[in-house]
Amino acid sequence: MALKAQNTISGKEGRLFLDGEEMAHIKTFEANVEKNKSEVNIMGRRMTGHKTTGANGTGTATFYKVTSKFVLLMMDYVKKGSDPYFTLQAVLDDQSSGRGTERVTLYDVNFDSAKIASLDVDSEALEEEVPFTFEDFDVPEKLSDTF
């Protein structure tokens, strides 16, 4: 069966949860896994081989600035050495697509940096971009594979 336009998934039909709390002020979210590879030179071959030796999880979340949560997390680390790890769950749920729901859970999420202050005379809504790393992930619910 062919792809139909209504089967595509709207990026607006999503939610993000931080330790079970919905982060309603999320604007964009992206998590990536990149494999770590070592080069392997092989006798008699001109092309370099590659062996996967591990993986690295990174991502970025952009929020509308409506809370001081990330500023306070960074301040707690700087002042007290407290560096918490979290669980994030991204949910895609575009009912009109007929594809079902996808849930991706990231474990041991640690935020890398936070904008501690921002002013912008031209901004209609201030935003804060928060890069992070994670150490494991799971897909407890996946989209349909068939049309």
Swiss-Prot record:
InterPro entries: DUF2001 (IPR018989), XkdM-like_sf (IPR038628)
Xref: Pfam families: DUF2001 (PF09393)
Superkingdom per UniProt: Bacteria
Homology family: To B.subtilis YqbM.
Protein name, UniProt field: Phage-like element PBSX protein XkdM
Organism: Bacillus subtilis (strain 168)
